[in-house]
Amino acid sequence: MAFKDWMNNLRDYFVEDDEEFNEPARPVQESRPTVASTPKPKVEERKAQPEYQTRRPAQSTSKAQTQTAAPKRAGSTFTKPMPEKIVQQQTVSQSQSVAATVSTIAIKEPRAYADIMESARIVKNGECVLVNFKFMGDAQARRSIDFMTGVVFTLDGDIQNVGGQIFLMTPANITVDAAKEMSILAGQNFESYDIY
């Protein structure tokens, strides 16, 4: 009886508090074929398996322990790959979310001041807009640039003169390398559309 009490105490030490353990341990120790027919004792023995392996050199191994240790090893290997599968699923979902966040640039050529509202809505939705004022008069273009500057300022974005009558409006999460832009624009006369 002392050995049985010692085994129960050892099992209780390794069984977590949230797991319920049924007490059909007496039939399990009396006849091994009943253990094979009932699935719950197998699950409990798998969880208790590491203590048998760690204590085995100190104890004398019996035939019953060696027979039950082999199925436990097979059961314990099935639980180890599961976290790896979860990690793989997370990386797939992360790559899918990265592919879903591809930025687009809308190109607009407004003909009147009222057409600028569509460009402002696009920037508000987090996309870039390239606006070409070639079909708009000088006074309306200046007024539109003032409006777009206010919209981009409110959204904490940026507006840049890309060339001639073309302006790029970007939301807050997108930056443009201004050094390359300034080297392209160097020496060209864009004073009539300068927003700075």
From Swiss-Prot:
Any one GO CC term of the record: cytoplasm
Stretches that traverse the bilayer: none
Annotated segments matching region Disordered: 16-81
Pfam families given in the database record: SepF (PF04472)
Coiled-coil region(s): none
Keywords noted in UniProt: Cell cycle, Cell division, Cytoplasm, Septation
Record carries keyword rRNA processing: no
Subcellular location: Cytoplasm
Any one of the GO BP annotations: division septum assembly
UniProt main location, coarse: cytoplasm
Function: Cell division protein that is part of the divisome complex and is recruited early to the Z-ring. Probably stimulates Z-ring formation, perhaps through the cross-linking of FtsZ protofilaments. Its function overlaps with FtsA.
Assembly and oligomerization: Homodimer. Interacts with FtsZ.
UniProt protein name: Cell division protein SepF
Lineage: Bacteria, Bacillati, Bacillota, Bacilli, Lactobacillales
